């Protein structure tokens, strides 16, 4: 029989590398001759500097205390990097945002404060966990907050109230108080509620996320959030949604307004999946129909609507934020019915803000302003009735405002018989 010859398989040679003369290499064994330095030098182009250093270190550590003898080379542990041409990397897509972004805010007293802007990419999957029978939706870049302080923790609430009162006076900001802008924060975080869909409102503090934080109507509210952030850090058990609404209540009362009903227990959303769409806040340049539709969407009637708009007697417009400029009343840090009185008593003429081109109404000496939605309150006969009522009876205005604002703070919140907020699974 003819002998079958086995095919000759070419042996694959290991990549060569230059080594120190103190290391002599054969095909299968290696003789280590100890030297004072006990180092192995390996030639490598700059791109392989890290690999070469790692190889040299591994050989040095392997035979640091070895005596002169022949041992087998462990190729699985000691590998000499071959000299190859570096591959050209393909263009990579933009990196996914996986960490909270911190916005540094220049505060009026020249101090800087940080506010976390949490962003969850739309395509990032959620991680589902089980916690006490409730499905928990979590992401890698947010801290899960499942509940706020208890309704029975009166002492804790009082401490938070005291801390809020301390940040309100600000002599170098606007008219000397942060009360109006903090009230606006509380107002806007609630005014996204939609009674037809059931989403929006203060529960969840969704203004921490885009797109709500970038809504044009919320421009300038970073000042209020920044002022309250140290309180949140000092009292971590209270949620942002409870803190912001409580701060709105305290601001009204500290500026001489009525006592506002408020209860704790709101939760904070863990990501942006339940952020309402932008455009739900009232637009100041629109007409009475827009006002009625916007407030009607939240569940308010004409009387409640006019009473809530009386808060325009506080604070002022800033052209750097909204494009409008000026104050509504002579005492913008004092809660009263002056807004209605000024609206009826002054003569208003349409003008523009020179720097922005935005239209607004001025009184004769241009010391006070009104927006188009304000003027609509005296154009619409149904709204005008309540404007006249509140201009003549401040006590009635205070009572109606307290009821309407308390209702605003509770939009979208369900409670049990003990006052505890009933959890919504989508917030957890």
Swiss-Prot record:
Cofactor annotation remark: Binds 1 heme b (iron(II)-protoporphyrin IX) group per subunit.
EC number: 1.11.1.-
Site (Transition state stabilizer): 184
Record field: compositional bias (Polar residues): 21-32
One of the GO BP terms on file: hydrogen peroxide catabolic process
Keywords attached to this entry: Heme, Iron, Metal-binding, Oxidoreductase, Peroxidase
TM spans (from-to): none
Region (Disordered): 1-33
Enzyme class: oxidoreductase
Family: Belongs to the peroxidase family. Cytochrome c peroxidase subfamily.
Full protein name: Putative heme-binding peroxidase
